[in-house]
Design a protein with these regions (language model features):
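Short, charged alpha-helical interaction segments and adjacent helix-coil junctions
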Residues: 2-19, 77-79, 84-89, 175-272
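Pocket-edge structural micro-motifs
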Residues: 128-131, 165-166, 202
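Low-complexity, glycine/alanine/valine/leucine- and proline-rich hydrophobic stretches
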Residues: 148-157, 162-167, 177, 181-186
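Accessory alpha/beta interaction modules
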Residues: 1-157, 170
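Active-site-proximal helix/loop capping residues that flank conserved catalytic or ligand/cofactor
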Residues: 25, 39-40, 98, 125, ...
Length: 272
């Protein structure tokens, strides 16, 4: 029979091994200082095999002393000096158009130094990889750029916003990348640049230790669930006492934090 400690360790391993790159924290671990993996993302999404990633950072905090600051999931720079912000969004509410606009603007203000000319402003790409097709046209990619209404020509200001629909998982290069985002086993990944890191994170002791915050998040969720369960049990016992003392359904609902349906069910059991 497993001890509590061994059982908890087994559960944690299961949690880690069930993670995929659509999990924001796990994606961060997969791409942290991993130029090759970041390069795959950018090359496939932009359709450019010549992109060379110079550096990649996760959870980059950009301070705005005059307004809203932001923490970017993934921030990469390529050999041409272009900046790429990649955000994974499982919630539709996390990927509104104005958020993409704001992220594009803070990249501009952060990377143009006071002594630089406007012409030196680097090209920026804000890429939202969404769990659902938030723009609702069933396209795999949505490339969004400013244009001139009168002649439909692009307004070349160097800013790019891209939405990637992760529901489109066909046999194209992009579709296979989307398949990999939902894959939990290294051996089943299409892109080998992801496999080695995933193998390390999921199946090595050092990798498990590296994922401390994921484990802590799991433990916090577990503790919260236990606390809620304990509180619920206390509320049930309290409600039983009120009903046994002849208090009304309405009074018991008001004071026990249980729903009316739950209190009525308790009352029917007590009177049975």
């Amino acid at each position: 029979m497993q001890t509590n400690e061994a059982s908890q360790e087994s559960e944690i391993k299961q949690v880690i091994r069930s993670l995929c790159m659509m999990n924001n924290r796990f994606m961060n671990f997969m791409l942290d200082d991993n130029k090759e993996a970041a390069q795959v993302f950018l090359r496939v999404i932009l359709g450019d095999d010549k992109i060379k990633v110079r550096n990649v950072r996760i959870q980059s905090f950009i301070q705005n002393i005059y307004g809203h600051s932001s923490q970017l999931d993934i921030l990469a720079q390529d050999s041409k000096g272009r900046y790429f912000n990649v955000e994974v969004q499982r919630s539709d509410e996390g990927a509104p158009a104005r958020r993409a606009r704001f992220y594009s603007s803070i990249l501009d203000t952060h990377f143009l130094q006071p002594s630089k000319l406007y012409e030196e402003l680097p090209d920026t790409y804000v890429i939202f990889i969404t769990e659902n097709d938030v723009l609702h046209d069933n396209l795999p990619l949505y490339n969004i750029r400013r244009r001139i209404d009168e002649n439909a020509k692009c307004f070349e200001d160097g800013s790019h916003i891209i939405y990637v629909n992760s529901q489109r998982r066909d046999d194209t290069a992009l579709g296979k990348l989307m398949q990999d985002l939902y894959c939990t086993e290294p051996k089943n990944l299409h892109y080998h640049e992801f496999a080695e890191r995933m193998e390390f994170l999921k199946y090595s002791k050092e990798g498990e230790e590296k994922m401390t915050d994921v484990i802590e998040e799991y433990a916090a969720r577990k503790a919260e669930a236990v606390a809620k369960e304990t509180a619920k049990e206390k509320n049930i016992e309290f409600a039983k006492g009120l009903l046994a003392d002849g208090m009304s359904i309405e009074f018991t609902v008001r004071h026990s934090k249980l729903t009316e349906a739950e209190v009525r069910e308790l009352a029917s059991k007590l009177s049975a």
